[in-house]
Amino acid sequence: MKCLLYLCLWCYCVLVSSSIVLICNGGHEYYECGGACDNVCADLHIQNKTNCPIINIRCNDKCYCEDGYARDVNGKCIPIKDCPKIRSRRSIGIPVDKKCCTGPNEHYDEEKVSCPPETCISLVAKFSCIDSPPPSPGCSCNSGYLRLNLTSPCIPICDCPQMQHSPDCQ
């Protein structure tokens, strides 16, 4: 019996009935065919495992946080109640203006759209944007840049993990 070791996920596998079962460490559980979204603290106000705007075009064999847990900035599943509170400047009455867009490779946009998100996953995922909120002022990435997640800085598209083997980025 041969078993594979997935060091990049800090997981291990066992052979069960001639199929590989992934065992996840920590507060995770394994789904043989899961959705595209996981619970991530920084994104819970927009999407989660049960409210995912990404339309699956294939099954995702990966570790997901257990119900009631979400990934923190280090990728560790923590109780959702322990996630830092995400408060947008608009929600606390501070207007978003050009001075607020101080991150590298970003600019102020009067009509920023939220769907599809300007994140790396949008390069390979289909989004259902039918019920997305109307455009609103905010900070957008410059052309040729995306974010790893909704709260990270803008990076060159070729730095997105999804573009790792793209001939356009060699």
From Swiss-Prot:
Modifications the protein undergoes after translation, according to the UniProt entry: Cleaved. Five disulfide bonds are present. When artificially cleaved by thermolysin between Asn-56 and Ile-57, the two obtained chains (called heavy and light chains) remain linked.
GO cellular component labels: extracellular space
Residues in the signal sequence: 1-19
Pfam families: TIL (PF01826)
InterPro entries noted in UniProt: Ser_inhib-like_sf, SerProtInhib-TIL_Domain, TIL_dom
Disulfide bond sites: none
Superkingdom to which the source organism belongs: Eukaryota
Sites annotated Cleavage: 88-89
Gene Ontology MF, one: metalloendopeptidase inhibitor activity
Record-level GO BP terms: anatomical structure morphogenesis; extracellular matrix organization; wound healing
Glycosylation sites: 48, 149
Keywords attached to this entry: Disulfide bond, Glycoprotein, Metalloenzyme inhibitor, Metalloprotease inhibitor, Protease inhibitor, Signal
UniProt induction comment: During humoral immune response. By lipopolysaccharide (LPS). Induced by A.niger alpha-1,3-glucan.
Reported function: Inhibits thermolysin, bacillolysin and pseudolysin, B.polymyxa metalloprotease and human MMP1 and MMP3. No activity on trypsin or cysteine protease papain.
Protein name as catalogued: Inducible metalloproteinase inhibitor protein
Native organism: Galleria mellonella
Upper classification of the organism: Eukaryota, Metazoa, Ecdysozoa, Arthropoda, Hexapoda
UniProt gene name: IMPI
